[in-house]
UniProtKB/Swiss-Prot annotation:
SUPFAM superfamilies noted in UniProt: C-terminal domain of alpha and beta subunits of F1 ATP synthase (SSF47917), N-terminal domain of alpha and beta subunits of F1 ATP synthase (SSF50615), P-loop containing nucleoside triphosphate hydrolases (SSF52540)
Gene Ontology cellular-component annotations: plasma membrane-derived thylakoid membrane; proton-transporting ATP synthase complex
GN (gene name): atpA
PANTHER family to which the protein is assigned, alphabetical: ATP SYNTHASE SUBUNIT ALPHA, MITOCHONDRIAL
Topology with respect to the bilayer: Peripheral membrane protein
Primary location: membrane
Subunit structure: F-type ATPases have 2 components, CF(1) - the catalytic core - and CF(0) - the membrane proton channel. CF(1) has five subunits: alpha(3), beta(3), gamma(1), delta(1), epsilon(1). CF(0) has four main subunits: a(1), b(1), b'(1) and c(9-12).
Protein name: ATP synthase subunit alpha
UniProt KW keywords: ATP synthesis, ATP-binding, CF(1), Hydrogen ion transport, Ion transport, Membrane, Nucleotide-binding, Thylakoid, Translocase, Transport
Location in the cell: Cellular thylakoid membrane
Source taxonomy: Bacteria, Bacillati, Cyanobacteriota, Cyanophyceae, Synechococcales
Positions bound to ATP: 170-177
Uppermost EC category: translocase
Keyword ATP-binding carried by entry: yes
Amino acid sequence: MVSIRPDEISSILKQQITDYDQSVSVSNVGTVLQIGDGIARIYGLDQVMAGELLEFEDGTEGIALNLEDDNVGAVLMGEALGVQEGSNVKSTGKIASVPVGEAMQGRVVNPLGQPIDGKGEIPTSDTRLIEEMAPGIIKRRSVHEPMQTGITSIDAMIPVGRGQRELIIGDRQTGKSAIAIDTIINQKGQDVVCVYVAIGQKSASVANVVEVLREKGALDYTIVVSAGASEAAALQYLAPYTGAAIAEHFMYQGKATLVIYDDLTKQAQAYRQMSLLLRRPPGREAYPGDVFYCHSRLLERAAKLSDDMGGGSMTALPIIETQAGDVSAYIPTNVISITDGQIFLSADLFNSGLRPAINVGISVSRVGGAAQTKAIKKIAGTLKLELAQFDELAAFSQFASDLDEATQQQLERGKRLRELLKQAQFSPLNLAEQVAVVYAGVKGLIDEVPVEDVTKFAAELREYLKLNKAEFIEEILKEKKLNDGLEATLKEVIKEVKSSMLATV
């Protein structure tokens, strides 16, 4: 028979009483009234913030967007197949945040910061709120450093500076994404962290972009945020803010960052879908009234910080798709008014064989001129004007039979300048190569070269400089100026390449 030991029993009871935890966890729980089309109506969530994360029974997350008298309208970030009417919903007390940090580089994540590239978890403990206030006036300084895209026509005529917002706008299939990806590739070795946000794109297209970046060695300093076409509208809406939050982390550490939003038209459409399903009143083109604020609060986060704040920068290249070149539609005009300039891509120029198909006449950079390097500013001053005049003259000359010699000469030079600015995809040029090519065209040194051989001449000129005049390239890249000595060298090189080429033609 087992002997009972009262002292042992009493000590156990005392221990239980001592360890008894009286704390009570209170959670704010509601009930799903209605669900469908990625929207849930919830009753009973009294203490909930606008934009707060909600947790459904099956683990799906949602965001509270509509706070009404008797219910809360929430958007679902997932398929939510397990959520039914009558299911419980819990408020988390948190606003959406994403992981940030060095470990994110080279990875592909979804808008919640979860890896989707099959390489395992991301080892980072730092997080940042998706929605952050943009830095104020005192925290900023004016744009003064160049963000070289590697595309001659942009760096010479529509220069982009670090901290600028430059819109890339054009019809579908005119090379908008190609310009953005070229810019990322050109940042190799520049200590710039790049974030590519793909919104509503085909998964195959995103996989293709990731593969190109990997081949070119650009994925090591790039983070890809992808919300595919098959994802919930809420995720497509959140993706740009996630990209901005990831880049902001590096910006506040004093680094230069570049963010591509490809494209904000799809984000606006996702936001319109959510808003209409939430029964918000529609405005122009059925977009909600605050779609301007949706884009402005995103793009205002791009900045060049003051030296007191570490001097970091976030350069934003938002992309907008137009319908049949209509830049006066609602979303294009909104984003044009928010940004510091736009690069307009023309379908007609693209189809005529001009790549990149930049329409120089209506493309502009409002602040990038201050950031342009002296070398290219010195020689490219007249380039934009000459090309704009060439476009007008070319249109006029179709109706005129006899043109005077000066007009004829201007047309011939315009044709050569346009040929010089043609550039293959994924092959950005460094500053020295751009200076050499633009100098040859603007100074009229290739007026004798047949138009059809101009592209070949530009390639041979760049090759000659690399092989025989490496010191010229080094000097330009280091000093970023074209002094008299370098100019004389360049003239000699152009003369030599031209004579050897004309001899073989």
